[in-house]
Amino acid sequence: MLTLRRRLGPVLVRELDADLLLLDADSDRIHQLNSTARFIWQRCDGKQSAEEIADLLASEFAVESRVALKDVIETLGKLQALNLLVDG
């Protein structure tokens, strides 16, 4: 069961309509998350598994569970590669 949590530290969060801006002070980079990635990011609390987040995503966005799980795993991988998530 894969669980990740948002990195603690210098990441400022700002809303931009349905998107979310993550301002990473360590890398001096700004990352813009669309509504799907935002939904996933906000649930990365170290308690919910990728599968649980995918179930919530499928319900919220009315998509098939397998599609939601693929999106969650892909998004988690990208966020982890950007050092915005750490192991839960």
Please provide the spans of the model-predicted regions.
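Long, low-complexity, charged/polar intrinsically disordered regions in eukaryotic proteins
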Residues: 1-25
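Long, charge-rich, low-complexity alpha-helical segments
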Residues: 16, 26-88
